[in-house]
Amino acid sequence: MRKYLIINADDFGMCHSANMAVLDLFQSGCIHSTTLMACCPWAKEAAALCHQHPEIHVGLHVTHTAEWENYRWGPMSSQAASLRDEEGYFFHRTEDVLYQANSEDLMREMQAQVQWLRKQEIPFTHLDNHMLTLQNHLIETLKYCQEEGFSFRLARAKDQTHPQTAAAIAYADTHGIAIIDYLNPNSDRFPNDRYTYASIRDSYLAMLAHLPEGVSEFFTHPAVESEELKAIAPDWRVRVGDY
C-alpha cells in the first residue's frame, strides 16, 4: 500500500490573521485543504478569498463551541437553544456541549452551517468537527454525510474500544463514506507556555519520517502574527508556529 498525506488548515474564517495564513500557505503549496468555520466573524472574508483564489480547496469545520474569552460567536440555526450559554453564544468547552446539547440541535446547526457555505457558492467536499463536539453523534453525522456526499474526518486507526467509534468506522466503510486511516497529532499537544518553534518542527519531521502506509492527515491551526491574534488566542505562539 502507498503512503498519502493530507495537510489541512483548521479554523479558516476564525479571524483575519488565520485567513491570511491559509491564503499564503495555499499559494506557497504548503497545504492541501482547509476547513472553514461558517459561524465565525471572518467567515465572509474567507468565502471571498475562495472565490478570488480557486486553488483553495475548502471543507466545513462544523462548530458548536466558542472557546475564547473575549471573542465569541453563536449558532447559525434559529432552533438551537441547547447550544447557547447564558449570553447566547456557544459554550466555551466541549464538555458543556456534550452535557447540555441535544442531538437535534447539533444536527440542525451542522445543516445550517452547510447551507450557509452553499449559499456562498463555494464548492466543498468534506466536513470535520471543531473540538470534537460530535463525538457522541458520529453515526448521525455520517448518515448526513452519506446523504449529502461528503467525506468526514474520522480515522480508522483510532481507539476502537469505544463502541461509538468502532460502529462509526464500520458504518463509514460499509456505506462508502471516505474517511482517513491515520490522524496525526499536531500542535495542540504543545502548551503555549512551553512551546518553541523547534519543538513542533522536530515533531512534524519525525512524524513525516515514520508516516504509515495508507491515508494520513495532519491538521494545523496556522495564523499570521498580529495584535488581533494575540488579543484573541492565548495559544497564539503555537498558531504562528504552525504558519
Model regions: which residues?
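Gly/Ser/Thr-rich loops at beta-strand to alpha-helix junctions
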Residues: 131-135
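Terminal accessory/targeting
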Residues: 1-6, 16-126, 136-243
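DG-centered beta-turn motif at the end of beta-strands
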Residues: 9-12
